[in-house]
Amino acid sequence: MNQTLLSSFGTPFERVENALAALREGRGVMVLDDEDRENEGDMIFPAETMTVEQMALTIRHGSGIVCLCITEDRRKQLDLPMMVENNTSAYGTGFTVTIEAAEGVTTGVSAADRITTVRAAIADDAKPSDLNRPGHVFPLRAQAGGVLTRGGHTEATIDLMTLAGFKPAGVLCELTNDDGTMARAPECIEFANKHNMALVTIEDLVAYRQAHERKAS
């Protein structure tokens, strides 16, 4: 990733710390992956604190595929089958079947309804019957080990939520341009600045975790 583009957001470690602070303050974070991978930016928010207004922003400026990143333990708790048995997607993205809250929603597609679905899925006592299938929220199962195992936005979201002190569950959506194309780094940086979001790369997070885990050992 071009560090000159990112310099206004600080050093790699500062970017991670700023992202964690933003999440704790209830703000969103823009997460960029490598230019040689998907080369896109995802807006992420804690599943616990995301507001209807933030969900509306995400739907308005994103791909429309609003995803809830969860752990394997949560997937099992909710009894969510993986979307396909044989995942042939380019990056092995861990989609489960889609979900809708069983209660408290209308069509399920509005920002308010999607927040209701997210909250139902992450409740401590959530059970499979709390969710209908299919729905308008796309759960993503993260790999154990986070970004040190798989350098994806799903794992980055779980890692950031955990480091920030939240439940390991977060909402993400890819940023798109007004013309329908995917937003790349320059557009993601402009959007993050406009909407008071922190910005971090998956590469930053990998280095941060490696450094802190070396210290811990």
Curated annotation (Swiss-Prot):
Where along the chain is Mg(2+) 2 bound?
A: E38, H153
Q: What is this protein called?
A: 3,4-dihydroxy-2-butanone 4-phosphate synthase
Catalytic activity reported: D-ribulose 5-phosphate = (2S)-2-hydroxy-3-oxobutyl phosphate + formate + H(+)
Concerning its family, UniProt says: Belongs to the DHBP synthase family.
Keyword Zinc-finger among UniProt keywords: no
Residues binding Mg(2+) 1, per UniProt = E38
Q: SUPFAM superfamilies per the record?
A: YrdC/RibB
**What does the record's cofactor remark say about binding?**
Binds 2 divalent metal cations per subunit. Magnesium or manganese.
The organism that produces this protein has a lineage beginning with: Bacteria, Pseudomonadati, Pseudomonadota, Gammaproteobacteria, Enterobacterales
Q: Where does D-ribulose 5-phosphate bind?
A: R37, E38, D42, R150, G151, G152, H153, T154, E174
Cite a single GO BP annotation.
riboflavin biosynthetic process
Coiled-coil intervals in this record? none
Q: What cofactor does its activity depend on?
A: Mg(2+); Mn(2+)
What GO cellular-component annotations does this UniProt entry give? cytosol
